[in-house]
Amino acid sequence: MAKDIKFSADARSAMVRGVDILADTVKVTLGPKGRNVVLEKSFGSPLITNDGVTIAKEIELEDHFENMGAKLVSEVASKTNDIAGDGTTTATVLTQAIVREGIKNVTAGANPIGIRRGIETAVATAVEALKANSVPVSNKEAIAQVAAVSSRSEKVGEYISEAMEKVGNDGVITIEESKGMETELDVVEGMQFDRGYLSQYMVTDNEKMVADLDNPYILITDKKISNIQEILPLLENILKTSRPLLIIADDVDGEALPTLVLNKIRGTFNVVAVKAPGFGDRRKAMLEDIAILTGGTVITEDLGLELKDATIEALGQASKVTVDKDSTVIVEGSGAAEAIANRVAVIKSQIESATSEFDKEKLQERLAKLSGGVAVIKVGAATETELKEMKLRIEDALNATRAAVEEGIVSGGGTAFVNVLNTVEALDLSGDEATGRNIVLRALEEPIRQIAINAGFEGSIVIDRLKNSEVGTGFNAATGEWVDMIEAGIIDPVKVTRSALQNAASVASLILTTEAVVASQPEPASPAPAMDPSMMGGMM
């Protein structure tokens, strides 16, 4: 396929047009009074959202050169979303500002490589200054504020702070669609896995159809139990203690299952059997997690252990186990705290080295089950369109909150960027590097300018007053008042602000140093096939 090639100013200006189209679409959503963007879907109702990365991913331009520019900005939004989970619109606004100012200087004859060095130095200084201005987040109220700012809902802020308090910072918080119109929080404490009882005759509460076991022993094995004789000596020993038993095995079938059920119905023995969670290597890892949590041992041939030789010492224990037809919850396992902490550390290191998103997600789930529990925010709304929009907002808020706990917070609403202007301006640079620094200085003003414009105020007036205000004082675009931003709860996570700036500078620098762009030529439309004369019949 033939290629179109553009050079120098032609190449850069075509890409800048794409940058502007995408950024102008996304930046209308910035701030407390930002607007929504409606995205057409190939099927179903349109998606209404103010989520920067969702909008950026949908934009596809007809001109190949413009599309490359748009895709590079979309990459900034995606990368920021991957690292910090929020701040995608801010990153887009910063990218546009750096590109716009940079192109002016490159066109005027400045060396793009020198400008790039200046931009990199200025951004590194700004990031250090942001970190120096950060305030750690530890209490529930601060977490609720971060989530409320990101989601634009105090109620959502309360749900997220409550969820993080109950399951911990490493805990899994999932967002699901509610069957009703109300949004609610559901917390499952302890370890839960998606396997229910193998027979409904094992339930202890016929009304709720659940089996509750108090202070049970837990037999954990990756073997299939078909012959009751294999575990009979163990069952006899447990029977003497009058305690219930939970069996977690590859499967329980053959004569073993009806024998266990019969003893349960007769009241001889309270036992519940469930299948082991997961598949393959993941199943072995999850069984090991359960064993460590409950202080038991996995009966497996890998360790040279047989069921017939199992003793009570090899069994796990917990204060309570609840089993329904779909899931099992183990509460307060008797495992040693040190062993659990070591296992958590191992899983954390596996998460860091995992390359696949799926593997990371599954490891994160295992980590949560070991270290606290699982919280589910069930999102309710009147229409499907509103539901999708609300889910996106809550996901952003959850990511922003985790980022805040990790690296602390700074004043929100674009104030933090203006607060570091003096530090960046003090850099002793010369020539094109000084030009690069000045480009960053101008770009740092852009988020607050856009927030003010979206709220109906004059951006330049707001910036001038902000520069002359004390550090921490900022403009509340929602009310038009000047307030102490952190006290007013208008805050941004440091991780979000620094990621937005670093990613914007990285991609903008690449665009400025571009000297040639190669794109595929659009294929000409194939002509319609000529009609076969023999098919014209009696028309002649």
UniProtKB/Swiss-Prot annotation:
Q: What class of enzyme is it?
A: isomerase
State the InterPro entries in the record: Chaperonin_Cpn60_CS, Cpn60/GroEL, Cpn60/GroEL/TCP-1, GroEL-like_apical_dom_sf, GROEL-like_equatorial_sf, TCP-1-like_intermed_sf
Top-rank taxon: Bacteria
Q: Which UniProt keywords apply?
A: ATP-binding, Chaperone, Cytoplasm, Isomerase, Nucleotide-binding
Q: What is its main location?
A: cytoplasm
Catalysed reaction equations from the record: ATP + H2O + a folded polypeptide = ADP + phosphate + an unfolded polypeptide
User: One Pfam match, by short name?
Assistant: Cpn60_TCP1
So where does this one cross the membrane? none
The GO terms this record gives for MF are:
ATP binding; ATP-dependent protein folding chaperone; isomerase activity; unfolded protein binding
The cellular component terms of Gene Ontology attached to this UniProt record, alphabetical and capped at eight, are:
cytoplasm
Supply the PANTHER family for this chain.
60 KDA HEAT SHOCK PROTEIN, MITOCHONDRIAL
**Its quaternary structure?**
Forms a cylinder of 14 subunits composed of two heptameric rings stacked back-to-back. Interacts with the co-chaperonin GroES.
Member of which family? Belongs to the chaperonin (HSP60) family.
Name of the protein: Chaperonin GroEL
Q: What is the lineage of its organism?
A: Bacteria, Bacillati, Bacillota, Bacilli, Lactobacillales
